[in-house]
């Protein structure tokens, strides 16, 4: 595997400076012989950062974002959603959560599914409901047990 800035392989991230795109893009390839200056690690300069971008060459992509309260999970997710909406402006974004709002993510106008709403337990979701969309599951660890079971059934639908 080789990380590179040479447009070889799959795009995985953009190099940002002050939240602005620098036009440098990070790629990953397993064809190491096609890359002149690749490597197995990449380090940004102190004034730059990486923004993960959706992979439009795969049918499905799953990210697991975790961290302590205040660590920047919503900030990271919001920026990822912005990149997703740039690539796929007509696709839906869903937030499945027990929390009524998240100002950061809600600024992007996702469709919210509140797991604490009484209808959630009776809604029958299909894979078609979420086809070609981005689904964010927020604070699943605090879902009541009964709702977690329903949510896990929903995950099975997603991955079929």
Predicted regions: what they are:
Residues 18-22, 64, 92:
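Signal-peptide-cleavage-adjacent N-terminal segments of secreted and extracellular proteins
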Residues 61-83, 94-103, 111-160:
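Conserved P-loop NTPase motor cores
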Residues 88-90:
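Conserved SF1/SF2 helicase motif Ia
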Residues 3-54:
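N-terminal pre-Walker A segment at the start of P-loop NTPase domains
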Residues 58:
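Residues immediately N-terminal to the Walker A/P-loop in ABC ATPase nucleotide-binding domains
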